[in-house]
Regions:
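Acidic/His metal-coordination segments adjacent to aromatic residues that form catalytic metal sites
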Residues: 50-90, 110, 149-153
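Alpha-helical bundle segments that constitute or directly flank the non-heme di-iron/ferroxidase center
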Residues: 1-13, 79-107
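Short, solvent-exposed segments of well-ordered alpha helices
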Residues: 16, 20-23, 80-91, 115-122, ...
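Long, repeat-rich segments with strong aromatic
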Residues: 94-179
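Long, hydrophobic, well-ordered secondary-structure blocks that form the structural core
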Residues: 1-62
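C-terminal accessory extensions/subdomains outside the catalytic/core fold
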Residues: 94, 161-216
Length: 216
């Protein structure tokens, strides 16, 4: 996502301020991916039983990941910088990214003896929080625009109607992963509820209607 989502639009916005923020988002994602890749490499070299290439097969073939993979690939096909930023940082990251990172990995990793992954993921979450802050402020400003605010909110609603169902499908597709840890300290239902509640708060901040799909 750092390369094919944020980097692809970091010169597309109408002001340098927005472009610079998007460029920082790209750097955040690329650094996060690099941290994970280096940790994966260290494990592959240190542990004979660890398959450092298994994640590729999982991403390409595991049924639980295919709705997420499709959503990510569809994000990379969006040409409108504002829609891509909205659908990525506001919708996908809240309903899928943070669901997996915050509501699963950060909750169960240490309980299952992994104290390193939460450190790496926690850094990624901190970066995303900063990215969310500028994204929320940007779309809140557009929603409150005296001349075009109503049209902007209507447009955001159209984007939500397309992407909320897709991201919820991706989120629910990940449900089997919650049953894999030996110490199952959280349930998928609890995690999804926490993620959707945070998503509602973001939507309220940018003053758009809450999609009906979140109440189902």
């Amino acid at each position: 996502m750092g390369l094919h989502v944020f980097t692809s639009i970091q010169r597309s916005a109408p002001t340098n301020m927005i472009n610079n923020a998007v460029a920082v988002s790209a750097a955040h994602k690329l650094r996060f991916a690099q941290d994970l890749a280096l940790f994966n490499l260290d494990l592959a070299e240190a542990e004979e039983a660890f398959d450092g290439s298994a994640h590729k097969e999982v991403w390409q073939s595991a049924p639980e990941w295919q709705p997420t993979r499709e959503a990510v690939e569809r994000l990379t096909a969006i040409g409108d910088w504002a829609k891509l930023l909205f659908c990525t940082n506001i919708v996908f990251e809240q309903l899928v990214g943070s669901l997996f990172r915050t509501e699963l990995i950060m909750q169960v990793a240490a309980r299952n003896g992994d104290y390193i992954t939460p450190t790496i993921v926690g850094t990624g979450e901190y970066d995303y929080d900063r990215d969310l802050n500028y994204t929320r402020a940007l779309f809140q400003m557009l929603s409150r625009d005296e001349q075009y605010g109503a049209q902007n909110r209507e447009l955001f609603g159209q984007w939500l109607s397309e992407w909320v169902p897709r991201c919820l499908d991706a989120a629910r597709g990940l449900q089997p992963i919650w049953s894999q840890p030996a110490d199952k300290s959280v349930t998928f239902a609890t995690s999804l509820e926490a993620a959707t509640e945070k998503f509602r708060d973001v939507l309220k901040a940018i003053e758009v209607d809450i999609p009906e799909e979140l109440n189902q």
